[in-house]
Amino acid sequence: MHRPLPIKKILRYARNLLIFFFASTILAVIVYRFMPVYVTPLMVIRSVQQLASGDKPTWKHTWVSFDKISPHLPMAVIASEDNRFAEHNGFDFIEIEKAMKENEKRKRKRGASTISQQTAKNVFLWPQSSWVRKGFEVYFTFLIELFWSKERIMEVYLNSIEMGKGIYGAQATAKYKFNTTAAKLSSGQCALIAATLPNPIRFNSAKPSAYLLKRQKQILRLMNLVPKFPPVEKKAVDKKDTRKKKKK
C-alpha cells in the first residue's frame, strides 16, 4: 500500500492547523462581541509575576456595561491615546508616519498604537513586545474592527485595561482609587486615569505627581477638542429606533 510522502503529511497538518487557528480566533472574537471579558492574559501574567516575587496576587476587576461608565472617561482616553479613534479602521496611519519620523531623531521610541490595537493586545495576546506579537496584534485588530462596533471596542478597552497594580478596568479603578463608581467619575478624575495609562504601575491616579497633574490639564484641554463619543447623531438615531419599536 502506497504511503503518502512525509511532505504531504506536513502540508496536511499545516492546512488543518491554519483552519483551526482561523476558525477558533474568529469564533472567539464573535463570542466576545456579546460576552463580558472577565479575564485577560495580562491579568493572569501579572498574578503569576506577583506569586513569583513572593507577593500576594492582587486582582481587582469588575465588568460594567458602557452606559455605567462616566461619559468623561472615553473622551479622556481618546484625547490622551487615540484622537482619531472614531474615524480610523483600527490603524492610525497618520500617527504611524509621525512616529516613524520622530523615532529617527530620538533615542526613546514612541509608539502609535490605537485603542483598537491596545484592546486586541489586552484581550487576546501577551504584553511583551515582539514582531510575532505585533503580527498577531494586527490580525486581531482587523477582526475586532470587522465584528465589533466602535462602542463595543471602547467598552471592552475601558473594562480590561490595566489602571494600577492589580487593578483592571474603570469600575475597579473608581472604587479603589477614588472611592466611587465608574459612572460617577468626574472629568478631572478621568483625565488623571488617562494620564497614567502609558505606565499605570509607575503612575498613581490617586496620588498624582506634578507631572501627572500637568498631563491632566493637557488632557482636559484636549477633551474639549476631540469629537464626542459615541457621536451625538448615532445616539439620537438609536433613540428614534427604540421609540419606533415600542410603538409597534
UniProtKB/Swiss-Prot annotation:
The protein's role, per its UniProt record: Peptidoglycan polymerase that catalyzes glycan chain elongation from lipid-linked precursors.
Enzyme nomenclature, EC number: 2.4.99.28
Name used for this protein in its record: Biosynthetic peptidoglycan transglycosylase
Subcellular location: Cell inner membrane
Catalytic activity: [GlcNAc-(1->4)-Mur2Ac(oyl-L-Ala-gamma-D-Glu-L-Lys-D-Ala-D-Ala)](n)-di-trans,octa-cis-undecaprenyl diphosphate + beta-D-GlcNAc-(1->4)-Mur2Ac(oyl-L-Ala-gamma-D-Glu-L-Lys-D-Ala-D-Ala)-di-trans,octa-cis-undecaprenyl diphosphate = [GlcNAc-(1->4)-Mur2Ac(oyl-L-Ala-gamma-D-Glu-L-Lys-D-Ala-D-Ala)](n+1)-di-trans,octa-cis-undecaprenyl diphosphate + di-trans,octa-cis-undecaprenyl diphosphate + H(+)
GO cellular component, one term: plasma membrane
GO biological process: cell wall organization; peptidoglycan biosynthetic process; regulation of cell shape
Organism name: Bacteroides thetaiotaomicron (strain ATCC 29148 / DSM 2079 / JCM 5827 / CCUG 10774 / NCTC 10582 / VPI-5482 / E50)
Keywords (A to Z) from UniProt: Cell inner membrane, Cell membrane, Cell shape, Cell wall biogenesis/degradation, Glycosyltransferase, Membrane, Peptidoglycan synthesis, Transferase, Transmembrane, Transmembrane helix
Protein topology in the membrane: Single-pass membrane protein
Pfam family, one: Transgly
NCBIfam families reported for this sequence: mono_pep_trsgly
Transmembrane feature ranges: 17-37
Similarity comment: Belongs to the glycosyltransferase 51 family.
Keyword Magnesium: no
GO MF annotation terms: pentosyltransferase activity; peptidoglycan glycosyltransferase activity
